[in-house]
């Protein structure tokens, strides 16, 4: 097993024999790969490539309340409470994209930004990478969500949002990770 600080090996024990686009739209490309598996057997692998970097914003006000947005998520056919999040296209910095998403979805602007971390959201089938921020020193404005977003906005105490990520009321991966990282950072103070 490679050491934690060793660079990854290209394709690791997998060998890609062919790659073709199975599906494509402005946001994702689905690749169909013919591969040789680690055990030497032939196989196939589907990979979802995301055009944009995902960003999420954990906005916390002076009363230690977290800003959540609620919306129906088409892929799950379920309603989801989550932090403001969205995609950052090439050419836009992650921080500028996070500022834009917070402003568009909620009308909120933040004076203070701290990067909380990065993660791969579903690395067995996707290359989607996410970056998340803590935003504070907030001022209110007017939201301008895009036509695909029918959003509700709610402020909840930080401790309640932490509980929601623990008991399954919040399942959005980016929200769970950002909230848990912020909670762990508070414990280590």
Spans of features found by a protein language model:
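Unchanged
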Residues: 43-44, 51-56, 61, 87-174
């Amino acid at each position: 097993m490679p050491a934690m600080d060793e660079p990854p090996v290209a394709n690791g024990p997998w060998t890609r024999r062919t790659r073709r686009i199975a599906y494509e739209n402005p946001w994702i490309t689905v690749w169909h790969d013919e591969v040789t598996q680690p055990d030497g057997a032939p196989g196939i692998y589907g990979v979802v490539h995301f055009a944009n970097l995902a960003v999420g914003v954990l906005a916390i006000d002076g009363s230690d309340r977290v800003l959540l947005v609620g919306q129906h998520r088409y892929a799950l056919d379920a309603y989801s409470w989550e932090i403001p999040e969205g995609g950052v296209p090439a050419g836009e910095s992650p921080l500028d994209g996070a500022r834009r998403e917070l402003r568009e979805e909620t009308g909120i602007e933040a004076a203070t930004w701290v990067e909380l971390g990065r993660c791969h959201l579903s690395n067995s089938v996707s290359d989607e990478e996410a970056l998340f921020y803590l935003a504070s020193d907030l001022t209110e404005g007017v939201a301008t969500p895009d036509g695909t977003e029918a959003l509700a906005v709610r402020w909840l105490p930080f401790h309640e949002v932490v509980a929601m990520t623990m008991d399954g009321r919040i399942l959005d991966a980016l929200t769970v990770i950002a909230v848990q990282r912020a909670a762990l950072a508070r414990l280590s103070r």
